[in-house]
């Protein structure tokens, strides 16, 4: 089974479309969607309505949530799947990519990371300020944590991995960069990167703020002291053609 963990905060306008697209992308796959919701609006009600149509949908509503990273971690704890994925609810991570991530996992990967920065990828859904901010965060992370240096897009929030990767990991996430935590503390030997095109947000509002940047720097400082220095891994980069091989 594949468990898709999705943290939500006031994303009511995107939920129905998101679930419908995931269902199409994962046709033929045994999957579940685990929403971990910190919303102040009617997002929980929308999720429960959608769950009547899609029984694969589950939700954990947190009245006193402590941010995206802890929401995802709670979702991992609830997940039943052999494979676990994380993605945003705002549709900037196109759900169809889940199909190709799953394909990479079935090929023998321990970790699959869609990248905006390899041939076939695109970060066009970011405005110029977000591109600078994202690039700076990526470079700082790679300087502070050697374990991130082989990964082209290590600060993304879109990824999939085998459950065993985090079974013995001491995850203490803060802020938003949950994949950085998993890469630094997990155990894995093969990473597959696949290209994807980051989309523009069409509904709802971005949740980024200056607080997110400060939390990220605090997270890096903490991880630098305790990341899994013994982990060794190889990275395999798939072209668009290889990724889509087998599509009808």
At which residue positions do the language-model features occur?
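Donor nucleotide-sugar binding loop of glycosyltransferases
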Residues: 11-14, 39, 94
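Acceptor/aglycone-binding surface of glycosyltransferases and processive sugar-polymer synthases
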Residues: 60-78, 83, 95-176, 201-211
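Hydrophobic helical membrane-anchoring modules
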Residues: 1, 144-149, 171-248
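Short, well-formed alpha-helical segments that are part of the catalytic scaffolds
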Residues: 11-25
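Short beta-strand/loop segment that forms part of the nucleotide-sugar
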Residues: 29-40, 60-62
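Cell-envelope/extracellular polymer assembly enzymes that use nucleotide-activated donors
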Residues: 1-3, 32
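A conserved acidic beta->alpha catalytic loop
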Residues: 37-46, 91
